[in-house]
Swiss-Prot record:
NAD found in the keyword field: no
Protein name: Cilia- and flagella-associated protein 276
A Gene Ontology cellular-component term: axonemal B tubule inner sheath
Tissue-by-tissue expression: Expressed in trachea multiciliated cells.
Statement: the UniProt record of this protein carries the keyword Amino-acid biosynthesis: no
Intracellular or extracellular location(s): Cytoplasm, Cytoskeleton, Cilium axoneme; Cytoplasm, Cytoskeleton, Flagellum axoneme; Cytoplasm; Cytoplasm, Cytoskeleton
Function recorded in the entry: Microtubule inner protein (MIP) part of the dynein-decorated doublet microtubules (DMTs) in cilia axoneme, which is required for motile cilia beating. May play an important role for the maintenance of myelin-axon integrity. May affect intracellular Ca(2+) homeostasis.
Organism encoding this protein: Bos taurus (Bovine)
Oligomer status and interactors: Microtubule inner protein component of sperm flagellar doublet microtubules.
Gene: CFAP276
Amino acid sequence: MPLTRDPFQNPALDKDDSYLGKSRASKKLPYKNPTHLAQQQEPWCRLSSTPTITSMKRDGFFFYSEIPKDDLDFRLAALYNHHTGTFKNKSEILTHQETIQDTRRIKTQFPGEFLPAPQPPLITSRANIRHWINPKKESIHSIQGSIVSPHTAATNGGYSRKNDGGFFST
């Protein structure tokens, strides 16, 4: 084995231009304005000056009393129509008012400042909604009208087996 050979030889790193022979000219034209001037023109000025909902919520003075506190509040605040929303996935069901409404006119509430109350959403006529009230108060401990199963909870200390069989657990 010759002494001049490198046992850990790495491939030589060459640029793309060395394989082609001569360098190619760039097809991309340089920008007309420098960056700091281009950001003051449309549409960049409008995009950078208009706050998003997320950036408004990060503001220290932002106050919104109806912010969901946990997953249950998040789901209850979501808009869901049981008639048209059947078998939709989670991302389609959990749609909030902020996603649908125009949020360009949301104003940040500063301390000591009182904003006018938002207009309530349009409510359909409640005359067509029927509400049934049971005239007889049912006991929650009664087994009358319960779901039929091979076990009954009427015994003390656990479940007992019915006459028709089935397994039980204690």
